[in-house]
Amino acid sequence: MRRPVIAGNWKMHMTCAQAREFMAAFLPLVADMPNDRDLVLAPPFTALSSMADLCKDSPIALSSQNVHWEGSGAFTGEISPSMLKEHGVTYTIVGHSEPRKYFSESDEQINHRARSSQANGLIPIVCVGETDEQRERGEAERVIRRQIEQGLEGLDADLLVVAYEPIWAIGTGKTCEAAEANRICGLIRSWVGSPDLVIQYGGSVKGGNIDELMGMSDIDGVLVGGASLQPDGFARIANYNVA
């Protein structure tokens, strides 16, 4: 039985003070959240310590927004799995389209990050997705399959989450039709060959489309960007209801 994972990625938003203000408003809104799902927040590294305290005795698990594959060393600006675990982190986001685009992250590097996460008891959320140009050229499936085959090599499918995020839908207000997102998620499941693999959808997820998305047979959760920055909006997503 696949357990849904609802995750919010704060990206480069929220100081510690802002995180505390958010949580003061958000926690009461998810106090009665159904217990058939997992709720995850990925704050900036600087807010992890504060968030670890704020999330105690709550249904919220913490994720990092990235992780390095080495345990220590001369890797300026990076952070190791053990450093994250010290702050109560249980998930790591790897392969997001922004580091792929802005820092030229390769599928091989993403695989190293994901494998290091699993080796250290963390659950990687591995992001995959196509650009608008690739979609228009009919290359979406080929691109995503390559990302899956190279990015997930050597990983335990029972200890990871895959997030399908069509890049053209991230932060644009454009949303992939639920049926099409479901079709791609189903393809990913077949390529990996694991019926129990948890697969999220990400890309302009909001309160107005969460129920439809979560009603799809192959969508097991969402990875939320901008809508996770507002307590009311993200609480609506966390408390989704599938009729």
Curated annotation (Swiss-Prot):
Catalytic residue positions: H96 (electrophile), E165 (proton acceptor)
Gene that encodes the chain: tpiA
Functional pathway: Carbohydrate biosynthesis; gluconeogenesis; Carbohydrate degradation; glycolysis; D-glyceraldehyde 3-phosphate from glycerone phosphate: step 1/1
Keywords: Cytoplasm, Gluconeogenesis, Glycolysis, Isomerase
Main function: Involved in the gluconeogenesis. Catalyzes stereospecifically the conversion of dihydroxyacetone phosphate (DHAP) to D-glyceraldehyde-3-phosphate (G3P).
CC annotations in GO: cytosol
Localization annotation: Cytoplasm
E.C. number(s) listed in UniProt: 5.3.1.1
Family matches, as InterPro entries: Aldolase_TIM, TIM_sf, TrioseP_Isoase_bac/euk, Triosephosphate_isomerase, Triosephosphate_isomerase_AS
GO terms assigned for molecular function: triose-phosphate isomerase activity
GO biological process, alphabetically ordered: gluconeogenesis; glyceraldehyde-3-phosphate biosynthetic process; glycerol catabolic process; glycolytic process
Annotated organism of origin: Synechococcus sp. (strain CC9902)
Pfam families listed in its UniProt record: TIM (PF00121)
Main location, first listed in the record: cytoplasm
Protein residues bound to substrate: N9, W10, K11, G171, S204, G225, G226
Catalytic activity: D-glyceraldehyde 3-phosphate = dihydroxyacetone phosphate
Complexes and interactors: Homodimer.
Top EC group: isomerase
Family, as annotated: Belongs to the triosephosphate isomerase family.
Protein name: Triosephosphate isomerase
Top-level lineage group: Bacteria
